[in-house]
């Protein structure tokens, strides 16, 4: 028998997370490692569990994630975005609560590019009067 599986793709900064939700006990696996081994801070783990808290589905699904690019925070938020999209695929009635919590919106903020003649995106070289 084919197993029921809900998929969602989440993005944040340079991170892309491919998320699969499978009915289970609430285990989260990121890149074939437990989420507590993969993410260094408890706050990030709480952050990516937010879609389950909003929809009151904590412990109903096992989460399998493949994520690459960016740092820990960007990856955690990409996973959160992917989980929200996968939950929406599982039950379209979650749309209202997920939308109100802002979990379906892709955060558009990206790193600003470095400009020529400047040290960073906006930081100019030190000015010397003489």
Curated annotation (Swiss-Prot):
One of its GO terms (biological process) is translation. It comes from the Bacteria. Gene3D superfamilies: 3.30.230.10. Keywords: Ribonucleoprotein, Ribosomal protein. Belongs to the universal ribosomal protein uS9 family. NCBIfam families: PRK00132.1. This is Small ribosomal subunit protein uS9.
């Amino acid at each position: 028998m084919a197993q029921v599986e809900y998929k969602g793709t989440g993005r944040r900064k340079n991170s892309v997370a491919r998320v699969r939700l499978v009915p289970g006990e609430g285990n989260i696996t990121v890149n074939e490692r437990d989420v507590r081994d993969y993410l260094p801070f408890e706050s990030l783990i709480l952050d990516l569990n937010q879609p389950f808290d909003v929809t009151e589905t904590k412990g109903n699904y096992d989460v399998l994630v493949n994520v690459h690019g960016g740092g820990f925070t960007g990856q955690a938020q990409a996973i959160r975005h992917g989980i929200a999209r996968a939950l929406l695929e599982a039950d379209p009635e979650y749309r209202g609560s997920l939308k109100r919590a802002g979990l379906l919106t892709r955060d558009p903020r990206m790193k600003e590019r470095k400009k020529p003649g400047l040290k960073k995106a906006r930081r100019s070289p030190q000015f010397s009067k003489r």
